[in-house]
């Protein structure tokens, strides 16, 4: 720990939080600098919480209903407005055009469910955006599934598992869509 601090020149301490659920709000930023809501993303991490495991594939309405059941529709709408204003202001002098993902999570503190409204901000096409397009492309209406990545060439099997591209000998990851029954 000391060696790592010496190399980086800094130390960051954060409280341990009992994370219950991971979400992201996806936005787009256009040429004029306007930031607009794109979609919600519900994702899972490895038990350590440090690595991505996969995204829920569901309609935008199902994702909206899932998160509003936990935090309320008014809270979600206010959060989207706050993110939008903050992102437009902070990116005013930026030339960035594209997707913006704001990760958030629900955690339990003293028995109460709480929302961390901004864990990190990603200025790129996020896994949530890819999951959105995978849902549109591969999931039949009314169905749900999981979008996931696996290290290595992968071995998609079964009629409910769809590899998203052919993998070559040098592939390091494989993307899959797995449909729920």
Enumerate the language-model features and the residues they cover.
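Phosphate-binding site of ATP-dependent enzymes
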Residues: 1-52, 105-118
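Active-site lining segments that contact anionic ligands and/or coordinate catalytic metals
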Residues: 22, 97-101, 114-118, 170-174
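ATP-dependent carboxylate/phosphate-activation module, predominantly the ATP-grasp catalytic core
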Residues: 27-85, 122-150
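Short beta-strand element of the conserved SAM-dependent methyltransferase core
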Residues: 104, 121, 176-180
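Peripheral (often C-terminal) accessory segments that flank ATP-dependent C-N-forming ligase machineries
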Residues: 140-181
């Amino acid at each position: 720990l000391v060696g790592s601090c010496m190399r980086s020149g800094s130390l960051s301490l954060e409280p341990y939080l009992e994370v219950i659920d991971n979400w992201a709000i996806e936005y787009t930023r256009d040429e004029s600098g306007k930031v607009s809501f794109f979609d919600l993303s519900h994702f899972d991490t490895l038990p350590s919480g440090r690595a991505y495991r996969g995204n829920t594939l569901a309609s935008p309405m199902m994702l909206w209903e899932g998160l509003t059941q936990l935090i309320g529709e008014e809270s979600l709408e206010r959060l989207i407005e706050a993110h939008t204003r903050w992102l437009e202001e902070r990116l005013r002098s930026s030339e960035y055009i594209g997707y913006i993902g704001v990760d958030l999570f629900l955690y339990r503190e003293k028995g109460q469910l709480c929302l961390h409204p901004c864990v990190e901000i990603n200025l790129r096409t996020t896994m949530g955006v890819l999951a959105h397009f995978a849902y549109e492309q591969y999931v039949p209406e009314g169905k749900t599934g999981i979008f996931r990545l696996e290290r290595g060439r992968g071995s998609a099997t079964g009629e409910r598992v769809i590899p998203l591209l052919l993998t070559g000998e040098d592939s390091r990851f494989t993307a899959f869509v797995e449909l729920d029954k």
